[in-house]
């Protein structure tokens, strides 16, 4: 769970300090800087970015990113619509509900968090229910409105388009895509370049950690 991940992060930071790993924060590295370092190996672990699909009415002005919400960079209104019922959407919905927000979670697939392991999934769904999150599945968003969405039930191709509105905030959690701004460019002057974690393929934290450990033992 989140508590285990939090403890793991603390452990990894402590180990880095123990072995003298230089850590630089709040700095966006450039190709020029990397070239000047003349490294033998570069590991690209730049993560993923929020996926913004081509849906009418969707723009950066009327939706919030899950990461900004979870990190406290933005504050939502009382009534919140979370679009996307994957792990990030479900976790965001839970987070907001625990802050006494009135949350609705909408998902196109017939089930929520379909890729989550069978042990963690029931617990997360139970948390959503206990936190009184309204969950709407089989709902394909047709258009984003200033205060909601229109959607159609995927089980009925010719069914009516319904409106879900009256929200103060909308959080977009419809997926992530790999973010690797210069992995290919690095190969021009670095002999060994490895892309791992979400930068390779958006997934779960334990998968990224496994890739990192596996790579570290082979370099």
How would you label these PLM feature ranges?
Residues 84-86, 175:
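Glycine-rich Rossmann-fold phosphate-binding loop(s) that bind the pyrophosphate
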Residues 87-99:
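N-terminal Rossmann-like FAD-binding beta1-loop-alpha1 element of flavoenzymes
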Residues 6-51, 58-78, 98-185:
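A Rossmann-like FAD-binding core segment of flavoenzymes
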Residues 55-56, 206:
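Short acidic, glycine/serine/threonine-rich loops at helix termini
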Residues 1-3:
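Short glycine-enriched, charge-decorated loop/helix-capping segments at active-site entrances
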């Amino acid at each position: 769970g989140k508590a285990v991940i939090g403890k793991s992060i603390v452990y990894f930071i402590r180990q880095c300090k123990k072995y003298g790993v230089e850590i630089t924060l709040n700095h966006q590295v450039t190709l020029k800087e990397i070239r000047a370092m003349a490294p033998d190996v570069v590991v690209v672990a730049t993560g993923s970015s929020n996926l913004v699909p081509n849906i009418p009415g969707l723009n950066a002005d009327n939706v919030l990113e899950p990461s900004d919400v979870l990190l406290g960079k933005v504050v939502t209104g009382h009534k919140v619509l979370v679009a996307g019922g994957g792990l990030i959407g479900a976790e965001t919905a839970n987070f907001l509900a625990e802050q006494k927000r009135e949350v609705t979670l909408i998902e196109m697939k017939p089930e929520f968090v379909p890729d989550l392991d069978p042990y963690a999934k029931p617990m997360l769904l139970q948390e959503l229910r206990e936190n009184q999150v309204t969950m709407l599945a089989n709902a394909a968003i047709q258009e984003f409105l200033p205060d909601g969405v229109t959607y159609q039930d995927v089980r009925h191709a010719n069914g009516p388009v319904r409106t879900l509105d009256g929200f103060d905030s909308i959080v977009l959690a419809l997926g992530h895509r790999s973010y690797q701004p210069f992995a290919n460019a690095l190969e021009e002057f670095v002999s060994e370049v490895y892309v791992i974690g979400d930068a390779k393929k958006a997934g779960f934290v334990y998968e990224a950690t496994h890739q990192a450990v596996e790579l570290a033992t082979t370099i």
